[in-house]
């Protein structure tokens, strides 16, 4: 048996191990297409600001081809460094594209104010054609989808500080798009707006240079469809992280935005580790979780072997990302989601509608959190030197805190309760039909008698005993239906008062002409 277990562990490790690169074969290269990237040919701030202005106009042109749009975006992304050409050549290693750098300098003879640097060759016409200044129709179209403030005609500046602020504002809006361009483009607008408000409050961006929605949609769609552009952006992030010492302000802002980009598309894997394993609830000892715990261990080792590109595997379209999906550990993932919904209010908005979602293990996670509230881990307490008296004090405080949190009914536990009017009879209520209808009426009658004879506390227990137990919970309402025992008791008392008042009103209905209306304050006081 011991040999079998060792073989099983070795099999799991080798199964999830990435392929070993061998030196016998060469690298597989695809059919490359050429991307032209304009870069400043001198150190003048005027040249850089004018190039930035022309590239922003170019991206807003709806007639721009995909490779040309990618080259313009790469040119903008590399404008904040001192030598953009060296940066692009150092970090670019793409088997699908071949990048050609074109140095741009100022020119008074071209309509765009720029020309391509060359030795004795007039390149003004080519520069105007590239920046779409040869056709007046396309020139007018290039102004659409630019800044929300229509009073801004251009962004050419002379001082480095002003240029860095404008460039940083534009770059922040581009980098934020990468966070959900691949994983959730339909719901990206709200999170992008929150990031924009954050950086505006921190004075990292200038609010007047907010780009139009259509311009941002064009860039988001290009990021989503062009893997080469995403490879360049990830390589630039990693290059900035490797830079020692103090970094430029724009580089620090890119690293800050990276916190929203990193591990995009890996929420199931990360949250399962966070809520399913790190919480260390005793439910992990179930036999059902043994195989999936071994799978998660292998995936964590594989994640570390992938190195610095592991958090970006979904953005880089790495085929190994499928191993990290929740379908590889459905029971443990369902349990972790139940734990997460109880511990964090932000988890209540997640979509659990997956084919492999198991409501039973979801409720197991919820119940595990509720019944373990206020308990102190003996292992952790011994490591921290917490005495038994301190542990009891912590448990008491934690229990009061949990009760206060439940009484406020925050997050996914908040349920909507509809109250009856005095003139509404049982015949007007929605009919369940058959045995369920008779069961509900019987439970109501028993609850009223129990309330009148024994009081609200024992009546609530009698009502709880007649609750149906065979009905499965809906996925979206699982967290609302399962309440804490004390919270359920309060709700039961309130509903029993409601039913009692409704019964009294039915008996007095013939004597009174005006129906009695009860609100929540009268019922719950």
From Swiss-Prot:
Phosphorylation at Thr-279 is required for the formation of the nucleocapsid. Residues 1-403 are annotated as: Ncore. Residues 477-505 are annotated as: Interaction with the phosphoprotein. The modification Phosphothreonine is found at residue 279. A motif (Nuclear localization signal) lies at residues 70-77. Residues 1-375 are annotated as: RNA packaging and organization of the helical nucleocapsid. Residues 433-452 have a biased composition (Basic and acidic residues). One of its GO terms (cellular component) is host cell nucleus. Residues 404-525 are annotated as: Ntail. One of its GO terms (molecular function) is structural molecule activity. RNA binds at residues 180, 195, 202, 260, 351. Residues 418-525 are annotated as: Disordered. Its main location: virion. Keywords: Capsid protein, Helical capsid protein, Host cytoplasm, Host nucleus, Host-virus interaction, Phosphoprotein, Ribonucleoprotein, RNA-binding, Viral nucleoprotein, Virion. InterPro entries: Paramyx_ncap (IPR002021). A motif (Nuclear export signal) lies at residues 425-440. It is found in: Virion; Host cytoplasm; Host nucleus. It comes from the Viruses. Homomultimer; forms the nucleocapsid. Binds to viral genomic RNA. N0 interacts (via Ncore) with the phosphoprotein (via N-terminus); this interaction allows P to chaperon N0 to avoid N polymerization and non-specific RNA binding before encapsidation. Interacts (via the Ntail) as N-RNA template with the phosphoprotein (via C-terminus XD); this interaction maintains the P/L complex anchored to the nucleocapsid template during the sequential transcription. Belongs to the paramyxoviruses nucleocapsid family. Ncore is globular and carries regions required for N self-assembly and RNA-binding. Ntail is an intrinsically disordered monomeric domain in the C-terminus. This is Nucleoprotein. It comes from Measles virus (strain Edmonston B) (MeV). The gene is N.
